[in-house]
C-alpha cells in the first residue's frame, strides 16, 4: 500500500481552523483501504497557547484512519523532519496552504527534489485572500517563483476559479487535479417551514473576509421576524466586537446569536432548525459549511465569491452579487414561501449535493491523484 505523508498546521482534535482540518480528515477517511496516510501537525489549535487534549506529543499515534504525530515547536527542525520523512519514505507528500513556513514552505523546500509534492492552496491565492496583508504575500510569492520552488509540484485545486487564480499568480505551466474537498457523511433532513419566522444560519471563522457586517446591516432593513445564528471561532476580536455593536443596534424583530465554536454534532442540530444558510464571504474556495448545509437539505444564499454555481437551476438556493438589494429580495422570497415550495428547495438542496459534491463521485479522482 502506497504511503501518503500530509503536512498541516492543525489537525483534529483541533477545530478552530475549520475547513482545511475537515478536508484532510475526510479525505483520509475516504481512502483507508487505498493508501496508508501519515500526518505531521502541530500540538495546538489555531491561536491557542495550550496543547491539544488527549494527544501524545512527538510520537506517532492512530487517529481515525491516519497515523499522526503532533510535533512541539522544538521538534519542528530540519533534522527531525528529514528523519521522519526518511522513516516513512512516502510515495507522495501533500502540503496544505501556501504561507505556512513550517508546514508548507519548509517541507516543499526540503523534499521537492526527492519526493513527489502535491500542494492544496486552500483558497489562499484568491484575490480576496491576497488582499489581506497583500504586500507581504506578493513579495513572498515573487521570491518563491524566482527560486522555482513550485516547479514540478502537482496542485490539488477544488474548482475552476482556483485554477484561474493559480495561473494568474503562480504560472500557467502547471500540472493539477480539480477535485472538490471531501465532506463528512451527512443525513438528509426533511424540513417544514410553516411559521413566519425565518431562521438563518452562518458557520464560519469570525474574520473580515467573511463580510458578516454586510449581512448584519442588511438585517436592519428586514421587517419580518428573523433569527440569525452565527457559529464559529472568533479569529479577529476587534472585528467581532464591531459585529456585536451592529447586532445590538438592530430592531426588535431581528435576533442575532454568536455561539462560538461548536462540535460537529452540535452544528448539525443547529442546521436542522434553520431555514436558510448564509455566506457573504469575500473569498471562498470551497466552503465546507455550504456543502454540509446542502447535504442536510438546507438551501443556501451565498455570495458570488463562493464557488457553487447553478443553485437556482436545481432549487438549492441562490448565488448572488454582494449587494443588499439582491440578498434582501431573496430573504423576503424565502420568508413568504409556501410550505410546499420550501419543500422543493429542501429536496433540491440534497439533490444538488448528490449530483455535484457527494464524495463517492470523486473517489476515483483522489485515487488517481495519489497513485500517479
Protein language model regions, located:
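A charged, aromatic-enriched C-terminal amphipathic alpha-helix characteristic of glycosyltransferases
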Residues: 336-371
Amino acid at each position: 500500500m502506497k504511503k501518503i505523508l500530509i503536512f498541516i498546521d492543525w489537525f483534529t482534535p483541533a477545530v478552530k481552523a475549520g475547513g482545511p482540518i475537515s478536508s484532510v480528515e475526510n479525505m483520509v477517511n475516504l481512502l483507508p483501504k487505498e493508501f496508508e496516510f501519515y500526518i505531521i501537525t502541530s500540538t495546538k489549535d489555531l491561536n491557542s497557547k495550550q496543547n491539544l487534549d488527549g494527544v501524545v506529543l512527538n510520537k506517532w499515534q492512530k487517529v481515525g484512519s491516519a497515523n499522526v504525530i503532533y510535533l512541539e515547536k522544538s521538534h519542528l527542525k530540519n533534522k527531525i523532519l528529514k528523519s521522519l520523512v526518511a522513516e516513512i519514505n512516502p510515495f507522495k507528500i501533500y502540503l496544505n496552504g501556501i504561507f505556512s513556513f513550517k508546514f508548507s514552505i519548509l517541507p516543499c523546500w526540503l523534499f521537492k527534489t526527492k519526493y513527489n509534492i502535491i500542494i492544496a492552496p486552500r483558497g489562499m491565492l484568491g484575490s480576496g485572500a491576497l488582499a489581506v496583508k497583500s504586500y507581504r504575500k506578493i513579495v513572498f510569492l515573487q521570491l518563491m517563483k524566482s527560486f522555482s520552488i513550485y516547479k514540478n509540484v502537482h496542485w490539488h485545486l477544488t474548482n475552476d476559479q482556483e485554477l484561474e487564480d493559480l495561473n494568474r499568480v503562480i504560472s500557467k505551466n502547471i500540472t493539477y487535479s480539480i477535485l472538490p474537498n471531501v465532506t463528512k457523511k451527512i443525513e438528509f433532513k426533511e424540513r417544514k417551514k410553516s411559521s413566519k419566522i425565518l431562521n438563518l444560519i452562518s458557520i464560519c471563522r469570525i474574520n473580515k473576509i467573511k463580510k458578516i457586517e454586510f449581512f448584519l446591516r442588511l438585517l436592519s432593513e428586514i421587517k419580518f421576524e428573523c433569527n440569525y445564528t452565527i457559529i464559529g471561532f472568533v479569529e479577529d476580536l476587534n472585528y467581532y466586537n464591531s459585529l456585536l455593536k451592529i447586532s445590538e443596534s438592530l430592531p426588535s424583530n431581528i435576533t442575532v446569536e454568536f455561539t462560538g465554536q461548536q462540535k460537529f454534532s452540535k452544528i448539525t442540530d443547529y442546521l436542522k432548525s434553520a431555514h436558510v444558510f448564509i455566506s457573504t464571504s469575500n473569498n471562498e474556495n470551497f466552503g465546507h459549511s455550504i456543502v454540509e448545509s446542502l447535504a442536510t437539505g438546507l438551501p443556501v444564499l451565498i455570495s458570488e465569491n463562493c464557488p457553487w454555481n447553478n443553485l437556482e437551476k436545481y432549487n438549492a438556493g441562490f448565488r448572488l452579487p454582494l449587494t443588499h438589494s439582491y440578498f434582501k429580495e431573496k430573504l423576503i422570497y424565502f420568508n413568504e414561501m409556501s410550505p410546499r415550495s420550501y419543500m422543493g428547495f429542501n429536496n433540491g438542496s440534497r439533490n444538488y449535493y448528490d449530483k455535484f459534491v457527494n464524495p463517492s463521485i470523486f473517489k476515483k479522482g483522489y485515487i488517481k491523484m495519489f497513485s500517479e
